[in-house]
From Swiss-Prot:
UniProt modified residues of type Omega-N-methylarginine: R136
Protein name: DnaJ homolog subfamily B member 6
Pro residues composition-biased segments: 252-262, 272-290
Region annotation Disordered: where it falls in the sequence: 243-365
GO molecular function terms noted in the UniProt entry: ATPase activator activity; DNA binding; Hsp70 protein binding; protein folding chaperone; unfolded protein binding
Region feature Interaction with KRT18, mapped onto this chain: 120-243
Assembly notes: Homooligomer. Interacts with BAG3, HSPB8 and STUB1. Interacts with ALKBH1. Interacts with HSP70, KRT18 and PTTG. Interacts with Slfn1; promoting nuclear translocation of Slfn1.
Annotated spans, Interaction with HSP70: 2-147
Gene for this chain: Dnajb6
SMART domains: DnaJ
Annotated source species: Mus musculus
Amino acid sequence: MVDYYEVLGVQRHASPEDIKKAYRKQALKWHPDKNPENKEEAERKFKQVAEAYEVLSDAKKRDIYDKYGKEGLNGGGGGGGIHFDSPFEFGFTFRNPDDVFREFFGGRDPFSFDFFEDPFDDFFGNRRGPRGNRSRGAGSFFSTFSGFPSFGSGFPAFDTGFTPFGSLGHGGLTSFSSTSFGGSGMGNFKSISTSTKIVNGKKITTKRIVENGQERVEVEEDGQLKSLTINGVADENALAEECQRRGQPTPALAPGPAPAPVRVPSQARPLAPTPAPTPAPTPAPAPAQTPAPSVSTRPQKPPRPAPTAKLGSKSNWEDDEQDRQRVPGNWDAPMTSAGLKEGGKRKKQKQKEDLKKKKSTKGNH
């Protein structure tokens, strides 16, 4: 007998959030489009995963399953479901696994890169029709879903189960289609998805083309191409080429906001640029100075005046001349001590004679 907890790979006390995470992982793993080489086994596993999620994601169904097993739900596995006596008076019919898959993913196509865009971009309106034909090899795009975050945590709409978006009062989405094809690997993968909305009476069609890792998004308004982006960046050249190919005029790009004028006071004058500071030259080392000789602060004596020659008698002058000791000059011949004594005696004798003559002269007068 199949154990739904084992099918999803969870424990019996797993939380509703764990159930959702497990279904997402197992449904993407065993989807028949991902396993074309083992399609029969994949279809069987995919159906079991859908049944397990239908039962364990509902509190009442899970309680009945825990008490009575699968027999308590369908009375022997006929697939048609029966009513039976239970505290819930519950009858159950398993749905098509593809319907469960589409309902879980909110009507979006997980086979295209469009699935990773804004989760509410194309949700509003009716549910899309049956899945388009898909043909994938072993290297399908599904391998990229292994690290995708939980839908329960990322998209609030999945927390309470699927709600038809038409009931939300948004009738903008009128159609949705998707076509994916490729070879044996990701190198030849191509996905094309188209969505149409009616916004303010205008028909807005968004076409996404993903090929070899490059995404091209074209937006039309009433059949007129309005914008074209490649990998999220607007490409004006590609837009012009596509419009020319379609025979349509190129839409004018919206001008950007004009810069606000800067008001300058009339008295204000532009400041002169401040010159760059010139580095000061490095001063040369001062030469060592010899200390000046100390100058005495004592006042110098004035020079002695030259002696004034006294005019007197000849005798006085001669006496002074005789009394003054004569200093020999360089021209004087050297004199011996005997010569000096002799000269002195002669002078004294002459002086005595002169005195006698003076006295005699005075006596005659």
